[in-house]
């Protein structure tokens, strides 16, 4: 089994606490509302929403995938960190066992946020991850993030 790690960093004008509430704490409600073509719904299968929780995300008609299951490892509301694993679903290829994700939102000096993400692809055997697979995932995540950011700018009184 191999582990391939990819890091990404980008910025937002939205303050970290507000962005964390929308992007992490209320994503299961917000994303289907603003991007139903991407995510149809999210449901908790086990747990209370905290560490150990297993969620099923059902994708919308605009997606190439049907569903995925996430297992939440940690949610830190004070330090604005979140980690989970993608453990099941058709977004995992036959060569990938799971993908671990870590997200940290850091308050930027200008009042916005620096978003730092780490993705760890756990492969089966000696399979290598193709760069275009990772790039496609990053582009989809960036697009979804921009939708959330746009929603927060259009609705400044929400998630305070």
UniProtKB/Swiss-Prot annotation:
<dbReference type="GO" id="GO:0005634">
    <property type="term" value="C:nucleus"/>
</dbReference>
<protein>
    <recommendedName>
        <fullName>Major strawberry allergen Fra a 1-E</fullName>
    </recommendedName>
</protein>
<dbReference type="Pfam" id="PF00407">
    <property type="entry name" value="Bet_v_1"/>
</dbReference>
<comment type="function">
    <text>Involved in the control of flavonoid biosynthesis in fruits, probably by binding directly to natural flavonoids. Binds the natural flavonoid quercetin-3-O-glucuronide with affinities in the low micromolar range.</text>
</comment>
<keyword id="KW-0568">Pathogenesis-related protein</keyword>
<dbReference type="InterPro" id="IPR050279">
    <property type="entry name" value="Plant_def-hormone_signal"/>
</dbReference>
<dbReference type="GO" id="GO:0038023">
    <property type="term" value="F:signaling receptor activity"/>
</dbReference>
<comment type="similarity">
    <text>Belongs to the BetVI family.</text>
</comment>
<keyword id="KW-0020">Allergen</keyword>
<dbReference type="GO" id="GO:0097243">
    <property type="term" value="F:flavonoid binding"/>
</dbReference>
<dbReference type="GO" id="GO:0009813">
    <property type="term" value="P:flavonoid biosynthetic process"/>
</dbReference>
<dbReference type="InterPro" id="IPR000916">
    <property type="entry name" value="Bet_v_I/MLP"/>
</dbReference>
<dbReference type="GO" id="GO:0009738">
    <property type="term" value="P:abscisic acid-activated signaling pathway"/>
</dbReference>
<dbReference type="GO" id="GO:0010427">
    <property type="term" value="F:abscisic acid binding"/>
</dbReference>
<dbReference type="GO" id="GO:0004864">
    <property type="term" value="F:protein phosphatase inhibitor activity"/>
</dbReference>
<dbReference type="GO" id="GO:0006952">
    <property type="term" value="P:defense response"/>
</dbReference>
<keyword id="KW-0611">Plant defense</keyword>
<comment type="subunit">
    <text>Monomer. Interacts with AP.</text>
</comment>
<dbReference type="GO" id="GO:0005737">
    <property type="term" value="C:cytoplasm"/>
</dbReference>
<dbReference type="InterPro" id="IPR024949">
    <property type="entry name" value="Bet_v_I_allergen"/>
</dbReference>
<dbReference type="InterPro" id="IPR023393">
    <property type="entry name" value="START-like_dom_sf"/>
</dbReference>
<keyword id="KW-0284">Flavonoid biosynthesis</keyword>
């Amino acid at each position: 089994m191999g582990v391939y790690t990819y890091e990404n960093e980008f910025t937002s004008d939205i303050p970290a606490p507000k962005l964390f509430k929308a992007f992490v704490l209320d994503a299961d409600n917000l994303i289907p509302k603003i991007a139903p073509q991407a995510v149809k719904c999210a449901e908790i299968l086990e747990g209370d929403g905290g560490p150990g929780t297993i969620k099923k995300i059902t994708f919308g008609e605009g997606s190439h995938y049907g569903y995925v299951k996430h297992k939440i490892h940690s949610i830190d509301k004070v330090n604005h960190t979140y980690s989970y694993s993608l453990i099941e679903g058709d977004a995992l290829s036959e060569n990938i066992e799971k993908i671990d994700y870590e997200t940290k939102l850091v308050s930027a000096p200008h009042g916005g946020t620096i978003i730092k993400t780490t993705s760890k692809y756990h492969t089966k055997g000696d399979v290598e991850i193709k760069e275009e697979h990772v790039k496609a995932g990053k582009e989809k995540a960036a697009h979804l993030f921009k939708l959330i950011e746009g929603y927060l700018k259009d609705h400044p009184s929400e998630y305070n």
